[in-house]
Amino acid sequence: PDLDGGEWYEIARFDHPFQEGTVGSRVVYRLLSESRMRIVYRGKDGRTGRDRISSAKGRLSADYECLRVSSCWFFYSDYTMSACDSAAERQWVVVSGRSAKYLWILARRPRLSTQVLVRILGQVEKQGFDTDKLHFVDQR
């Protein structure tokens, strides 16, 4: 997954307890070596305004198709970049888990145009994801 190089804003996601109620969320993927990454997630609790920050380590597969992420030493989850724009400088990506339970739409800016978002949602639906379950993130 080509996620290195700065900040990505969370446009939409399948909500999970570890992110529920989070607004203004963004993530930074930082390449540490050829196969290792540091991942930092930041957002705010939508009710209290308190910062929510978490970090994880990631390891890229040999073919760079999968990112194995661990937020604690014994538990790993695998993620793939299931869709992205075709620009040399990626402006948006869709990251998904191995199952249909995990999905994030990330972008370089806090908002995407309606035209781009409709195209992304079409691609996501073709891959079998239920877009009705997407939670669109308030980027305050």
Regions found by a protein language model. Give the residues of each.
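A beta-rich soluble binding module of mature secreted/lumenal proteins
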Residues: 1-140
